[in-house]
Every structure is written in C-alpha cells, then in structure tokens.
C-alpha cells in the first residue's frame, strides 16, 4: 500500500507534467472583478467548487473510473459537464498530458481522455480505497487553485496554507460521499464559478489559460 500511495502522490504532485499551474479554473477572472479579494473569499469560492461545482463532479468521475466503471460514458459526461471551451480544454489537455506520461511509466497504455477519468483509470490498478483516491485528487485540484490565488490576489504563503487546511474537513466528507455516488447523480451547481470560467475566455489581460 505504501508503494501505491507513493505512486498516486507522484501522479498528483505539482511537479507531474500536466501543466496544472497554467489553469486557474476561472479564478483569474473572479479575482480581477473583485469577487475574490482575500483568503475568506477564496475559501468560500473553493468550498462551493468542492460541494457543488466542477471539483465535486470530477470527484465522481475519479471514483467511478477507479471503481472500474466503463470509461466511455465517463468521458462523455466529463465533456458534457465542461461549461465552456476553456473548461473543456483544461480537462482534455491535462488528461492527454497525464496519459502520455503515465503510459511511459506503466505497463498498460491508455488512450487520451479527460483528466479525472484518466486519474481514476490509472488509480484502479493501485488497489487503494476509492475514497482515498478521491480525497487526494480533490486536495491536489484545490491546491493548484490556491497556488494560483496566492500569486493573483495576492495572499501570503501562510494564508494560502491556512485556506488549504480549512478545506480538509470538507474534502474528507466529500470524498466519502463521492466514492459511492453513481454517475446518474453527477452534476454541477456553482453558477458564479462557471460564469467566471466563461468570461475568462474574453479577458484581455491574463496569465492563466483558463
């Protein structure tokens, strides 16, 4: 189990070449308009992503792939849930990069697929509890956004880590719930986050791809 956890941690590390640092998931737009101005705003925004936004939808996709569900319906759901062109490119391109690198590291090859589906598909072979896989994915997802927010708002590094730690209870609860949630119950409801992701496509001055 230790070896399996190390491998999953490697795959979800910021150093793994999926260019996660290039995506803000609409945060850059929300910060530029003043919707997110401090650590408290950031925490509330990320909580919404985690409980009703794309983050929790990704958690379902990771869980179902890790549990061995057919991958094609999961890939179709991932594309359908991407609310904008940039959101689709975010999950598609990171997934392709993840698959390309893990194909060189693993005995079996996967075809390109959306990022959460690819992570879940690879994690299935590790034999880890599905809830644990989901929890680590959610933490990595949110950690990447916090890193971007620290630079954009800006926040101090300590404030960023405080936000991250404040999310742990919700991550734990969500991971347990999402581990058994069927694909038929997947969905998103973080409307402001989706609108920010759409508006980012026409933002004139920007650093991040999404």
UniProtKB/Swiss-Prot annotation:
Required for maturation of urease via the functional incorporation of the urease nickel metallocenter. GO terms for molecular function: nickel cation binding. Belongs to the UreF family. InterPro entries: UreF, UreF_sf. PANTHER family: UREASE ACCESSORY PROTEIN F. One of its GO terms (cellular component) is cytoplasm. This is Urease accessory protein UreF. It comes from the Bacteria. Gene3D superfamilies: Urease accessory protein UreF. Pfam families: UreF (PF01730). UreD, UreF and UreG form a complex that acts as a GTP-hydrolysis-dependent molecular chaperone, activating the urease apoprotein by helping to assemble the nickel containing metallocenter of UreC. The UreE protein probably delivers the nickel. Keywords: Chaperone, Cytoplasm, Nickel insertion. It is found in: Cytoplasm.
